[in-house]
C-alpha cells in the first residue's frame, strides 16, 4: 500500500497578500528539487507578478507561466501533469488568490484527480508576522482538511529584533495545523545586497556562478542554511524522489538494439 509519504506531490506555494518571501522560497525549493535529481515540473501562476518564471527565463530549468484560476489554462495544467507524470509539480500561486484557488480546486475536483494520478497535494504557506497569512491558511485548512498535507515556512526576515511569530504561535490556526500533522520550517535571510544583485541580473540559483564572488558565497551560505530546513519536510516537499538511473543490464541491453 502506498503511503502519503511515498506519493508524488503537487506543491502549491501560498503566501497571503504577498510580500512574505513566497517567490524566494519557490526558488530555493526548486533549486534543491532539481539538485536532488527529482523530476519536477514548475509553474508560476502569479501572472501579475511572475518573478518565479522571470528568474528562470535564461536557465535550462524553465518555469511555465500559467493562469491557474483561468479554466482553459487550468485544463492545460492538469493535462500536462497527466501526460508528463513528473514526480513533483511545483506551482507558485498568486497572493490573495485564496477564494479563486478554492473555487478552481472544487471545479476540477483536484484532490480526486491527484489521487487518481498517484499524487498527494501539499499546501506550502510562507509566513510573515501579519494576520493575513494566518487567516489565508486557516481558510485553506478548513476547506481542504486532511485531503492535503501542510508546510509552514517562517521567513526569518520577519523574525528579527521586535518582529516575531507570536501571532502565529498562539493562533487557533496553528493548533489546527498541528492536528493536521503540519510541518513548520524556517527560511534564512538572504543578504539584501545579494538579493538585489540577483534580482537586477535576473538570475536563477542555478546560475550562481555568474555572480560576483562575494555575492556567490552569500548565496551559497543561504542555500547551505536552507537545506536542513527543507529536508525536515522531505516527504511533504517531494525531496525524497530521485529520477531512477537505468541499470547497467538495461544499458547493455539498449546498446545492443
Spell out what each predicted region is.
Residues 135, 209-257:
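C-terminal accessory extensions appended to soluble enzyme cores
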Residues 104-130:
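Inter-motif core of Ras-like GTPase G domains
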Residues 18-19:
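Walker A (P-loop) phosphate-binding loop of P-loop NTPases
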Residues 43, 123-128, 151-156:
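Conserved beta-strand segments of the P-loop GTPase G domain that flank and frequently precede/overlap
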Residues 22:
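Conserved lysine of the Walker
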Amino acid at each position: 500500500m502506498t503511503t502519503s509519504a511515498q506519493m508524488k506531490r503537487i506543491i502549491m506555494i501560498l503566501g497571503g497578500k504577498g510580500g512574505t518571501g513566497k517567490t524566494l522560497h519557490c526558488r530555493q525549493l526548486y533549486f534543491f528539487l532539481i539538485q536532488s535529481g527529482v523530476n519536477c515540473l514548475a509553474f508560476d501562476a502569479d501572472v501579475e507578478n511572475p518573478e518565479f518564471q522571470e528568474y528562470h527565463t535564461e536557465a535550462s530549468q524553465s518555469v511555465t507561466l500559467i493562469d491557474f484560476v483561468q479554466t482553459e489554462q487550468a485544463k492545460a495544467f492538469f493535462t500536462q501533469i497527466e501526460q508528463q507524470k513528473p514526480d513533483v509539480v511545483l506551482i507558485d500561486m498568486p497572493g490573495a488568490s485564496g477564494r479563486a484557488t478554492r473555487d478552481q480546486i472544487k471545479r476540477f475536483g483536484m484532490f480526486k484527480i491527484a489521487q487518481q494520478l498517484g499524487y498527494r497535494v501539499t499546501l506550502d504557506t510562507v509566513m510573515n508576522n501579519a494576520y493575513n497569512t494566518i487567516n489565508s491558511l486557516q481558510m485553506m485548512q478548513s476547506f481542504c482538511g486532511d485531503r492535503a498535507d501542510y508546510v509552514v515556512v517562517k521567513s526569518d526576515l520577519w523574525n528579527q529584533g521586535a518582529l516575531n511569530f507570536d501571532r502565529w504561535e498562539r493562533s487557533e490556526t496553528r493548533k489546527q495545523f498541528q492536528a493536521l500533522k503540519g510541518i513548520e520550517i524556517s527560511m534564512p535571510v538572504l543578504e539584501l545586497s545579494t538579493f538585489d544583485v540577483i534580482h537586477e541580473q535576473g538570475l536563477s540559483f542555478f546560475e550562481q556562478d555568474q555572480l560576483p564572488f562575494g555575492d556567490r558565497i552569500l548565496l551559497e551560505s543561504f542555500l547551505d542554511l536552507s537545506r536542513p530546513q527543507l529536508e525536515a519536510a522531505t516527504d511533504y516537499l517531494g525531496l525524497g524522489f530521485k529520477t531512477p538511473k537505468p541499470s547497467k543490464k538495461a544499458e547493455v541491453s539498449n546498446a545492443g538494439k
